[in-house]
Amino acid sequence: MGCVQCKDKEATKLTEERDGSLNQSSGYRYGTDPTPQHYPSFGVTSIPNYNNFHAAGGQGLTVFGGVNSSSHTGTLRTRGGTGVTLFVALYDYEARTEDDLSFHKGEKFQILNSSEGDWWEARSLTTGETGYIPSNYVAPVDSIQAEEWYFGKLGRKDAERQLLSFGNPRGTFLIRESETTKGAYSLSIRDWDDMKGDHVKHYKIRKLDNGGYYITTRAQFETLQQLVQHYSERAAGLCCRLVVPCHKGMPRLTDLSVKTKDVWEIPRESLQLIKRLGNGQFGEVWMGTWNGNTKVAIKTLKPGTMSPESFLEEAQIMKKLKHDKLVQLYAVVSEEPIYIVTEYMNKGSLLDFLKDGEGRALKLPNLVDMAAQVAAGMAYIERMNYIHRDLRSANILVGNGLICKIADFGLARLIEDNEYTARQGAKFPIKWTAPEAALYGRFTIKSDVWSFGILLTELVTKGRVPYPGMNNREVLEQVERGYRMPCPQDCPISLHELMIHCWKKDPEERPTFEYLQSFLEDYFTATEPQYQPGENL
């Protein structure tokens, strides 16, 4: 039925308040959503105290249910409060075990039991079969969660990453929950102009007291679906009309199956090692399969690297860490040789990607965005009161679309090799380690911040070893005397200043990862708006 109230008068001109600047919108356009930017003013010479900084950090994509949502627990009822709501599949799914169901996009289900959280017992109305289905692959029939364009809890920066992915035309759009206003939504649209090139505009969708929705009060709608239909037919004040929903990509599963959710020590025979991806000091990394049908990464540890008992204890904590910028731990084989089974990232380590892969051609905006993703994952680790202890580009993995995820968090504490535990031994990563951690074993989230500063140098130098020309002993001595790496070639001074603040001698003076995430996400609007690509960066 369309527009509840839709006046044909010109849309009121609103100022576009975006990324700290005010620009008058042209023509008949609405102003884009003035999402507040959570950074202090950043000058070249002085940086404020970061540690009291609070930002609304963006979370990963949770379409419906899954680990970031509590909306799918308990009894499932229809709007009238009786009976059972039907759910519809948003994606195809291939069964991994005899307990779960294969299904196709569009298939409808009756939910029999939703108490397992991420896995629901369901009956397919197409086949009549009963089994478990991943809860984030389905949504209630006719709900906004079932719409192609609805992305749920997706942060502003992640919305921009998805919309700016290669191949999306101007007018690609999505709707997500507002980060700043409870009950409201944001419409994010890919746009293009001569000045900015490809970019994303965000519009706040506000809710009326009677349940309707509007971007401007001149055009009000009973449902979000009607709003989308209206702006798909005409721009009507937006930057352009809505052309096509953004591609969602498959949701991430945090378990291999419903059985491994709680019992995730698995038999070695269920794993097949297919292709060796890397060989390190303490073991190898393989691409393989679980159960013959699910692609995984398998880290095999040399016997004696760590105590199986200590590893299993730490793995209990690691399994509970769930964030879209952390490599998900799926399962373990806890008898030696220990196997660690995680999600597979097809581009390998960030270090190899920068030195020998596609990363060699990347310019500063991509590199800063990758750093922002790492900071987002570390901000989650910070919130969870956990510590990584070995943050460097070799322990960051890369996937399609320059997606970065943190791997091997927490494992360094368990290593029993004397060449490592001595901290000045040959296998210990001195060049990435904060002095208080290297000298006195004081590992904290603030020593991780130091390591992040070193990782920033790896990014802008495309994988160069830190402190070139210096050995570990020299690095330790020089850093204790106050030496810090100079600004790398072509690196903006403002980014080097951020590194220097990560390398403050007093750990408490170093920034939080929450601040680092926000600063890097808004770097090219708040700090370096005049950036022009150079030969290297």
From Swiss-Prot:
A lipid is attached at residues 3, 6 (S-palmitoyl cysteine). ATP binds at residues 277-285, 299. Residues 271-524 form the Protein kinase domain. GO terms for biological process: activated T cell proliferation; adaptive immune response; axon guidance; calcium ion transport; cell differentiation; cell surface receptor protein tyrosine kinase signaling pathway; cellular response to amyloid-beta; cellular response to glycine. Inhibited by phosphorylation of Tyr-531 by leukocyte common antigen and activated by dephosphorylation of this site. Residues 14-35 are annotated as: Disordered. Keywords: Adaptive immunity, ATP-binding, Cell membrane, Cytoplasm, Developmental protein, Host-virus interaction, Immunity, Kinase, Lipoprotein, Manganese, Membrane, Metal-binding, Myristate, Nucleotide-binding, Nucleus, Palmitate, Phosphoprotein, Proto-oncogene, SH2 domain, SH3 domain, Transferase, Tyrosine-protein kinase. GO terms for cellular component: actin filament; cell body; cytosol; dendrite; endosome; glial cell projection; glutamatergic synapse; membrane raft. A lipid is attached at residue 2 (N-myristoyl glycine). Pfam families: PK_Tyr_Ser-Thr, SH2, SH3_1. Its EC number is 2.7.10.2. It is found in: Cytoplasm; Nucleus; Cell membrane; Perikaryon. Changing residue 410 to R: In a metastatic melanoma sample; somatic mutation. Its cofactor is Mn(2+). Autophosphorylated at Tyr-420. Phosphorylation on the C-terminal tail at Tyr-531 by CSK maintains the enzyme in an inactive state. PTPRC/CD45 dephosphorylates Tyr-531 leading to activation. Ultraviolet B (UVB) strongly increase phosphorylation at Thr-12 and kinase activity, and promotes translocation from the cytoplasm to the nucleus. Dephosphorylation at Tyr-420 by PTPN2 negatively regulates T-cell receptor signaling. Phosphorylated at tyrosine residues, which can be enhanced by NTN1. The keyword Phosphoprotein applies. Residues 149-246 form the SH2 domain. The modification Phosphoserine is found at residues 21, 26. Belongs to the protein kinase superfamily. Tyr protein kinase family. SRC subfamily. Interacts (via its SH3 domain) with PIK3R1 and PRMT8. Interacts with FYB1, PAG1, and SH2D1A. Interacts with CD79A (tyrosine-phosphorylated form); the interaction increases FYN activity. Interacts (via SH2 domain) with CSF1R (tyrosine phosphorylated). Interacts with TOM1L1 (phosphorylated form). Interacts with KDR (tyrosine phosphorylated). Interacts (via SH3 domain) with KLHL2 (via N-terminus). Interacts with SH2D1A and SLAMF1. Interacts with ITCH; the interaction phosphorylates ITCH and negatively regulates its activity. Interacts with FASLG. Interacts with RUNX3. Interacts with KIT. (Microbial infection) Interacts (via its SH3 domain) with hepatitis E virus/HEV protein ORF3. This is Tyrosine-protein kinase Fyn. It comes from Homo sapiens (Human). The gene is FYN.
